[in-house]
Each structure stands twice: as structure tokens, then as C-alpha cells.
Amino acid sequence: MSRLGNRAADWADDEEFDDPSALPAQQVTTNKDGTKTVVSYRFNDEGKKVKVTRRIKTTVVREHVNPQVAERRSWAKFGLEKGHAAGPSFDTTSVGENIVFRPSVNWRVQAAEAEKAGPEKGSIKDQLKDKKVKCRICSGEHFTARCPFKDTMAPVDETAAAGAEPGADDVPAAGGLGAGTSSYVPPHLRKGAAAGGERMAGKYEKDDLATLRVTNVSELAEESELRDLFERFGRVTRVFLARDRETQRAKGFAFISFADRTDAARACEKMDGFGYRHLILRVEFAKRAT
């Protein structure tokens, strides 16, 4: 009898009892219209079990990306991620929106003014959303001080000052030492700035004569590819490919500087009308600043 009693106790131990704190497993059902219905359970703030039903529709969005970027995505994972499936791992990667931070030149002053004015002035983002940086030399979306052609091409203001009337030399140099007015005048607009022989371009004058302007460039073009195309005709000293700040794609034009003008002329003759990435390149000498 003792053995039978022990067996009965063992049978009772094998019985499975429902745990009130356990949640049912998630259920995923595929519908006829292609959507999925996901049923899950959770506890709310009051400790009650809540059933959550979600209907998920999968949408495929195709976008054209740089072929080199697509190639890097197909590389096999290495390190701690070696052997994992392609794509980001949700255990180690959090996919979010790519936010690019671009502060303005005087963002500290604007932030201080916004704090003093209060919420009625709006946020800094609302104040700066319509402002864009424009280079005074090549009209690109970057600061003039960072322009790669600042030594070979003159700014627009300097070109206007060079064409000033000769009688302007008699005007006192406002803004200089000992000036009577408090207004500041840039050095290139002061007395004698437009006189002949004072512009010292030096070695960059030669680079200015050997610079080509290439238009109708593909959006997927790279500076290294343009350098390889033009280095066949001579030594290339500088390659500048204008890019869009938001998409980082080429804006359709580039500047190629050669060490020798003869090589630049030969490259202009051969590459003008050349087919590159299903587009016909237009190559000409960059306009020299007067």
C-alpha cells in the first residue's frame, strides 16, 4: 500500500498547473490580403492582463543607392557578428533616423537670444531651416573659407572691386587705421586695393589657367573615378566634385586642375563629349577671374 501511495503522490507532482503570472505565447496569423495579425498579451499599469491585436501590412520600397554602398552591405560579417544573418541584428543594433547636425556660424548667440525671448520666438531649428550656406567663389553649398578653389578663383566681391572707377582712389580708406567712421570696410575694398600689380596670385595663377570645368556628371560619380579618367592626359593636382548636402550625391559638375596647361588642353579636347555612366560629359576651361 505504501508503494501505491507513493505512486499516487508522484502522479500529482506530474500535473501541470497554470501559472497566473505567465503570459500566453504570441500568435501570428497570415491573412488572405497579405497582411499579418499579431496577437500578444501584456500587463498594464494596474497589473491586469491585456490582449493586444495588431494588423501589420508589409510595403516594399525600392530606392537607388550607390553601387559601392550596396556592395558593402553584401560583405560577410566579422568579429562578434561573424556567422550572423545579413542585415542589422536587433540584439546589438538600433535602427533609427539618420540625423545630421549642422550648426550655424553664430549658433551660440542665436541660442542665447532664443532663451531670453522665450517660446514665442520659436526653436533654433525653425529659425535656421530656410538658411543655406553658399560659397562666394564656386557657388557651392559650403563655406567660402573651405572652398578648394579659393586660391585659384577670385570671389565675386573682388571681381567687382577690380572694375571700380579710377577716381575711387581719391576716396579716403574708410575702416582702416585712423579712419573717421566706425563702419568696417574689407581690405580688398580699401584705397589702392584695385590698383594694378597688387594681386599676387603667384603659383596659383598657373593653376587657374589649367583648370577644367566638367558638367553633366552623373549623380553616382566619385572623385577617384574622375581622377582616373583625367590622369591619363597628365598630372592632376586637384579634383573637386560638388555634392548635395542632404543626399551626398553629385550635383552634376566638377573642377579638374592640371599641373600643365598643355595637358589640360589635351584632356579638354579628348574628354569633351566622352560617355561616362550613360551621360555625355561637357568639358571646358574654367572661366578665369578678371
Swiss-Prot record:
Pfam family, one: RRM_1
UniProt keywords, alphabetically: Cytoplasm, Initiation factor, Protein biosynthesis, RNA-binding
GO CC annotations, alphabetized: eukaryotic 43S preinitiation complex; eukaryotic 48S preinitiation complex; eukaryotic translation initiation factor 3 complex, eIF3e; eukaryotic translation initiation factor 3 complex, eIF3m; multi-eIF complex
Main location: cytoplasm
Disulfide bonds: none
Cross-referenced InterPro entries: eIF3_g, eIF3g_N, eIF3G_RRM, Nucleotide-bd_a/b_plait_sf, RBD_domain_sf, RRM_dom
Protein origin, superkingdom: Eukaryota
GO MF term (any one): translation initiation factor activity
Any one of the GO BP annotations: formation of cytoplasmic translation initiation complex
Domain RRM: 210-288
Protein family: Belongs to the eIF-3 subunit G family.
HAMAP family the UniProt entry points to: eIF3g
Subunit organization: Component of the eukaryotic translation initiation factor 3 (eIF-3) complex.
Protein name: Eukaryotic translation initiation factor 3 subunit G
Organism of this sequence: Aspergillus fumigatus (strain ATCC MYA-4609 / CBS 101355 / FGSC A1100 / Af293) (Neosartorya fumigata)
Species lineage: Eukaryota, Fungi, Dikarya, Ascomycota, Pezizomycotina
